[in-house]
UniProtKB/Swiss-Prot annotation:
Cell compartments where the protein resides: Cytoplasm
CDD domains associated with the record: PTH (cd00462)
GO biological process: protein quality control for misfolded or incompletely synthesized proteins; rescue of stalled ribosome
Protein's UniProt name: Peptidyl-tRNA hydrolase
Organism expressing this protein natively: Campylobacter fetus subsp. fetus (strain 82-40)
Active site, UniProt feature: H19
């Protein structure tokens, strides 16, 4: 079983923000259909299941994402976990893959690492660094030029995640799917 968790913040006001690219990728994957919604209360998030694939959108707000992942991990005990999140240190449109490592200052990743460790794969989607404060920038919406490109980036990431689920080799996926801005 594989758990794919997209990080973001709940609520309409955050729906199209840079910090929610993880949620956006889960929504892109859900469009393929065939997923059943699983009771969300005990998992502190929206959980969807299709065969041996679980998709998760934590409802804990970004900085407490680990609570939701831990609940799902403890119940389902997936063989593999893939976390999708925004990355300020990568230019917009860049996509990188890694296993484990440091949180890079991302509080959602810190929360996950603190509760389940860091032995999981990560899909890092670059959002760049704006001129505003970090909080204003990550909670801001994409500009029009970025919105058009974002659709392609999300489609690219979806293909990478599906292949990662199939092959299980983050190094192979990184070689094939790393995207530069």
């Amino acid at each position: 079983m594989t758990l794919v968790a997209g990080l973001g913040n709940i609520g309409k006001e955050y729906e199209n923000t840079r910090h929610n690219v993880g949620f956006m990728l889960i929504d892109t994957m859900l469009k393929d259909g065939g997923f059943n919604s699983v009771s969300s209360g005990k998992f502190q998030g929206e959980l969807f299941k299709k065969g041996s694939l679980l998709l998760l959108k934590p409802s804990t707000f970004m900085n407490l994402s680990g609570n939701s992942l831990k609940a799902v991990n403890d119940f389902y005990k997936p063989d593999n976990i893939i976390v999708i999140h925004d990355d300020l240190d990568l230019p917009f449109g860049t996509v990188r893959f890694k296993r484990g490592g440091s949180s890079g200052g991302h509080n959602g990743i810190k929360s996950i690492d603190n509760l389940i460790g860091n032995d999981y794969d990560r899909v890092r989607i670059g959002i760049g660094r704006g001129n505003n404060s970090v909080i204003s920038y990550v909670l801001g919406e994409f500009i029009d030029d970025e919105k058009d490109r974002l659709k392609d980036v999300l489609a690219h990431c979806k293909n990478a995640v599906l292949e990662l689920i199939s092959c299980g080799d983050i190094t192979q996926i990184s070689s094939k799917f790393t995207l530069k801005a």
